[in-house]
């Protein structure tokens, strides 16, 4: 049942019921099982038991609910969870390689350009985004863990990674243009 959530190297599904739309298939129970499975896969990939995972989400209505369930699943497998709140997909990758953060893994809750009722997850380590085979492994494991009534109470430390990431971007643009105010005098149309 969870295997159908695979969309290449992402997980995508319907998280909000709409009139005449597809049935919900990315539920909190599914997100909980996916969180547990991601923790197991990450521990095996890194060959370590104590893992730190950062979660971020876009502004979709279902994001907070799905992250709570995913975070609870991560906690259930012993992962320390850090909540970056509203974030961008590139920022979640950068959270794995930025000094002072260097998370073992990160997850972005997003469905990119898809309609509002959809949502999903993208997974990262310092080596980059998870690939199709990794997602298949997560969903195969999650299927064995899937149960109704999953726990969605989770513990996470809230962090401000977006402020750090934004400062990195500003610095890179200033260095690249050799200007303190590289956009000064330009008009956006």
Give, region by region, the residue ranges found by the protein language model.
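Ferredoxin-reductase
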Residues: 46-126
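Positively charged, low-complexity intrinsically disordered leader regions
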Residues: 1-33
């Amino acid at each position: 049942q969870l295997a159908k959530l695979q969309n290449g190297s992402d997980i995508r599904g319907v998280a909000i019921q709409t009139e005449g739309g597809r049935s919900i298939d990315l539920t909190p129970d599914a997100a909980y099982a996916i969180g547990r499975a991601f923790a197991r896969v990450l521990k095996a990939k890194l060959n370590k038991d104590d893992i730190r995972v950062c979660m971020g989400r876009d502004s979709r209505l279902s994001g907070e609910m799905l992250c709570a369930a995913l975070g609870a699943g991560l906690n259930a497998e012993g992962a320390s969870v850090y909540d970056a709140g509203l974030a961008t997909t590139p920022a979640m990758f950068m959270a794995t390689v930025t000094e002072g953060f260097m998370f073992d893994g990160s997850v972005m809750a997003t469905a990119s350009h898809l309609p509002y009722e959809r949502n999903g997850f993208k997974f990262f380590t310092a080596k980059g985004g998870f690939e199709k085979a990794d997602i298949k492994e997560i969903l195969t494991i999650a299927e064995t863990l899937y149960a109704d009534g999953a726990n969605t109470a989770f513990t996470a430390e809230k962090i401000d990674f977006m402020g750090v990431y934004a400062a990195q971007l500003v610095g890179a643009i200033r260095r690249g243009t050799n200007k303190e105010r590289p956009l000064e005098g330009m008009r956006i149309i």
